Amino acid sequence: MDSLKKIVAYKAVDEYVQSNMTIGLGTGSTVFYVLERIDNLLKSGKLKDVVCIPTSIDTELKARKLGIPLTTLEKHSNIDITIDGTDEIDLNLNLIKGRGGALVREKLVASSSSLFIIIGDESKLCTNGLGMTGAVPIEILTFGYEKIIENLLKIYTLKGCTYKIRKRNGEIFITDNKNYIVDFFFTEPIQDLLETCTRIKMTTGVVDHGIFVNMTNVALISKHDGTVLTLNKKYE
């Protein structure tokens, strides 16, 4: 599986990253190979004068260890390209992200990018709709979190869901933004994606959710035979 992650990450960097770019760095195991490839190209001199914006403390630490030049969204608000992984992707390039806990920063950096590229292996591709392979995360305030969840359960598309407050090592997981994550589990593919997103986001106390709709420009999907499938956003 790691070999598939490496193939698709290297291809994304080689095909889309150029010198003098501001680059958004996603979070997760596949993105590690993006860092590795950027580092290789910088050290070889094939890539020059780039700065990168990490979407999590974890990515920041890994990038610093490699010596990759970093900046902030405050200093570089217009990002040329962001490369990130995903938990699920449908054929319209809509996503479920955030099972690693960095969904808010990932979404903010992606929305600030001219080009948002998703990478992953074919196990992430969901041809029958989103929400069926695992948690759909929602980041919420710690204050009044039980009331926030109560209000979320009133949303018609969430009524049949089960949920869990995310924990790590037996303790409630705290995001880089000092919030909680509540993971919702669907029994059928999410209906009315846009309406569901709107209602979740409008719930007081919700910071953001892991449903990314109409944000991805290109998806690179590595297949088990070592080839890479390229999916492009459809423009109407």
Swiss-Prot record:
Entry EC no(s): 5.3.1.6
Catalytic residues (UniProt): 106 (proton acceptor)
InterPro entries noted in UniProt: NagB/RpiA_transferase-like, Ribose-5P_isomerase, Ribose5P_isomerase_type_A
UniProt-listed CDD domains: RPI_A
Family stated for the protein in its record: Belongs to the ribose 5-phosphate isomerase family.
Quaternary structure annotation from Swiss-Prot or TrEMBL: Homodimer.
Pathway(s) served: Carbohydrate degradation; pentose phosphate pathway; D-ribose 5-phosphate from D-ribulose 5-phosphate (non-oxidative stage): step 1/1
Superkingdom of this protein's organism: Eukaryota
UniProt entry keywords in alphabetical sequence: Isomerase
Keyword check for Isomerase: yes
Record's catalysed reaction(s): aldehydo-D-ribose 5-phosphate = D-ribulose 5-phosphate
Cited Pfam families: Rib_5-P_isom_A (PF06026)
UniProt name for this protein: Ribose-5-phosphate isomerase
SUPFAM superfamilies, alphabetized: D-ribose-5-phosphate isomerase (RpiA), lid domain, NagB/RpiA/CoA transferase-like
Binding site for substrate: 27-30, 84-87, 97-100, 124
GO molecular function: ribose-5-phosphate isomerase activity
Function as written in the Swiss-Prot or TrEMBL entry: Involved in the first step of the non-oxidative branch of the pentose phosphate pathway. It catalyzes the reversible conversion of ribose-5-phosphate to ribulose 5-phosphate.
One example of a Gene Ontology biological process annotation: pentose-phosphate shunt, non-oxidative branch
